[in-house]
A protein has these predicted regions:
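Short, aromatic/His-centered strand-loop micro-motif at the edge of beta-sheets
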Residues: 76-108
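Short strand-turn-strand beta-turns centered on an Asx-Gly dipeptide
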Residues: 121-129
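Secretory/extracellular carbohydrate-interaction modules
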Residues: 2-83
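Residue-level detector of high-confidence beta-strand sites
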Residues: 56-57, 129-131
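Ligand-recognition surfaces built from glycine- and aromatic
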Residues: 134-159
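Hydrophobic residues positioned within well-ordered beta-strands of beta-sheet architectures
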Residues: 17-19, 42, 109, 143, ...
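A generic beta-sheet turn/junction motif
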Residues: 50, 113-115, 149
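Short tryptophan-centered beta-strand motifs in secreted/extracellular beta-sheet-rich domains
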Residues: 19-21, 104-122
Length: 159
């Protein structure tokens, strides 16, 4: 129920993660992101080297909602204090598939990188797939989860 949650799971390759959760809506108190935007979202972190270098798979609520894949790369920086909102880049799938905004209720979000190819499944539907090898080159770290202004209950798993 906190405005921001960040976590990583120690061990594993960091290339696979799943979150089964119930989205209970926006938190009572909301915080702006480093960019200044206020958004309710739940997501997975893959190859999370640190807070400045990783791949995100985020499921956003609201009218501009849906699943978004993005990298955050800031070479030489490792803490959010150092990089803030710098280094984000949205990745586009060569085969775009629509994904619905996150709404209240039970959900599952899964992501897997295999030989540089990312597949994202939301509530059983393939919503994003494509080659991310150039975007993740050199990243090494665990998988994790992230929430912003989203109340959830659920379970997280990784490889």
């Amino acid at each position: 129920d906190a405005p921001t949650t960040r976590a990583v799971a120690k061990g594993g390759t960091g290339a696979t993660a799943a979150l089964r959760f119930t989205y209970l809506g926006t938190t009572a108190r909301t915080d702006a992101l480093s960019s200044g935007e206020v958004r309710s979202q739940v997501g997975l972190k893959l190859l999370a080297e640190d807070g400045c270098n990783l791949l995100y798979v985020m499921w956003r609520a609201g009218e501009r909602g849906g699943v978004v894949v993005q990298t955050k790369r800031n070479r030489g920086k490792s803490t959010s204090f150092e990089c803030g909102a710098d280094g984000y880049r949205i990745l586009t799938s060569p085969t775009p598939r629509p994904s619905a905004p996150l709404e209240a209720g039970p959900h599952e979000l899964r992501a897997r990188i295999d030989h540089g190819r990312l597949e994202v499944v939301a509530d059983g539907a393939l919503v994003w797939e494509g080659d991310v090898s150039a975007a993740i080159e050199g990243l090494r770290g665990p998988a994790g989860l992230r929430t912003d202004n989203a109340r959830i209950e659920g379970t997280f798993s990784t490889d």
